[in-house]
């Protein structure tokens, strides 16, 4: 930053700017916020403003640009949405009364995590600011808040990966750290698009000391202290709406890592990156902003407590049984504004008259909502009824004080009702009488002078004036009119009578506006005292809203109440993918069963591409998530256990940021499942091993299946194109083969989308290529090659996986962060002679070329090592690491 001290004002600017070097400084000058120097150059580009200069005659003129103060919020939003900070510097005294330089201070630092003006587009989204600290024990403290609602939660988390997963789940834009957080983790967070801010010293505030009352460990007190201090320092205003910190345990909810949430398209469509086409989109029939935010929170954290799940189910069932009452409830909820964020604006001091009318309107719906819930006559809603506090004293106070349609700004006056305050009424009478007197004076002066177009007006510079066109100036008396302003075609004058009346009117206006603002602040403080009650009411209404949303979608899409079982039996009858069904229409969707009893843990799924294998897998995961949210599910009947975790590997996506290949990402996601899954988990693996050479992939796929079967025992859906693996059902007793049906009709492939028992008999790959529109000659050539390959396979026994010749795996530039512990895997696996013949002892990888090139010494060495490898005695991660080493040797 080029420091400029040509004037006292620029010296003041630079002194303030030095305190906020990483932020745009919006420096108030009159009716504009100005930016100077580098801020102006960059800001003009980002905000599409005209770049000008200050001190044109100077040797080095100062770049500057500005935005009008009345429109400043929109410009702040643009910068913050792009990941910048904005320091708002205000004039702290009236420039007219200032002696010397006007005093200025930064009144707020707006950052991605502290932005509270979310607008309509963000009404149903939380904006979380997160803090992170590290204890000597290696455990992380994590706390987050949404400043617009006052929500504040904290947790202790072990491991960097778990921390990153939690941050991504929260979709946090900004993380506040202290010195305990290592630079490596800071860089990983930055790579994920999070702004890193620092806050080392903790400051205590008596106003909000209550937030730590329920914290029982030093780690949690430390991280909440860091978070609250940062908010206090940057926002510089009341935070009375911050709620007591709630300690939560991530293990108390169904765990899904970020990859699984992404693969399942819970809240963001993989293709469009938008809400449409997601499970959240399907389930969202909420009528309030609060309900919309709570729905997403429930979706992010499904329950694992059976009693809590069944309590939600019971309330959804009750709402389903009462159609008319449910409709009445929806009509009432539509009239409820965002109580949480209204309460936040009250605490911040940014609430206006229209906000208070919205609050009043919302509170007036509560008695109607109470009546509707009472009409249900369902005991499961007793707690809800007890929490429906209408906060009638606040509603009454607003109704008595505020006009029904107040102006946007309190400073403009006209917000307080007539009759509310006697002194205010007197000032207003003086103003009204004065304006009546002005109208009478105008008529009188026209009559006396004979000037019909004479008029009385007002502006902020000259006050009240009498305006006469120049052609009529000769008609004015010479002794009564005092010239005030000359215009092109007219002159403006004053008279002694007009001056006196102007003084009285302006004095009344000034006192009226000041008194009105004082009365408004008193009302705001009265509402502020009820913030806790308003927040509790908001929570009850939000919960009601989500439950009625569940009831609506359950009725509209013919969902059923799932039965939760204590064992491991899973039985979904005629299950459906809810989002695909909504897009296609119910008549076009083919439902399928999923049956896995206590003796079946793995379904090995085969079938052609595009036949619906991935959809089948996703629909089971979505059914589980919906059930554990408390919603009904898309099926004719459903029985299921309560799952503790869901792991998925569906689809292929390179991690370009960290330089990891598709295969490495695939192995890492698979490893997370193998490392952390329990017998109560659900695993979905789609085409594991396809990212590497054929036999490498097949070997890994088989080893992973065996590992899950023999060690993990989780319910698993595993789709594959390796048809040799279907023979595993002979040795793995808890594995069953199923396939997606397809038939050939007149040379064309017809997908049945129906899951059938047993393995698929063909892969139909060339048929799928035909459906994709591949050239006819290419398809004909593929048929010839396929025939040759099949004949070669029939004539040559295939080599065992331990002796197979395979190409090295794709490059992987980063090591796996956590690994499956290999503790005598061979001891837990079946003996080699008892294994399925999925990979026989003499198989060799087929070549599309008749003449194989001569091997280099390095290639020959790798081939020798492959032939000596004992695949059955290795973990999946050990295999992957060995393949990675070979790849490094072959690419040198």
From Swiss-Prot:
Residues annotated to bind ATP: 607-614
Pfam families per record: MutS_I, MutS_II, MutS_III, MutS_IV, MutS_V
Top-level taxon of the source organism: Bacteria
Region Disordered, residue ranges: 796-842
GO CC terms: cytosol
Any one biological process term the GO annotation gives: mismatch repair
Compositional bias annotation for Low complexity: 796-830
GO molecular-function terms, A-Z: ATP binding; ATP-dependent DNA damage sensor activity; damaged DNA binding; mismatched DNA binding
Keyword match DNA repair: yes
Family matches, as InterPro entries: DNA_mismatch_repair_MutS (IPR005748), DNA_mismatch_repair_MutS-lik_N (IPR007695), DNA_mismatch_repair_MutS/MSH (IPR017261), DNA_mismatch_repair_MutS_C (IPR000432), DNA_mismatch_repair_MutS_clamp (IPR007861), DNA_mismatch_repair_MutS_core (IPR007696), DNA_mismatch_repair_MutS_N (IPR016151), DNA_mismatch_repair_MutS_sf (IPR036187)
UniProt keyword terms in alphabetical order: ATP-binding, DNA damage, DNA repair, DNA-binding, Nucleotide-binding
PANTHER family cross-referenced by the UniProt entry: DNA MISMATCH REPAIR PROTEIN MSH1, MITOCHONDRIAL, DNA MISMATCH REPAIR PROTEIN MUTS FAMILY MEMBER
Family note: Belongs to the DNA mismatch repair MutS family.
Function according to Swiss-Prot or TrEMBL: This protein is involved in the repair of mismatches in DNA. It is possible that it carries out the mismatch recognition step. This protein has a weak ATPase activity.
HAMAP family on file: MutS (MF_00096)
Record protein name field: DNA mismatch repair protein MutS
Source species: Levilactobacillus brevis (strain ATCC 367 / BCRC 12310 / CIP 105137 / JCM 1170 / LMG 11437 / NCIMB 947 / NCTC 947)
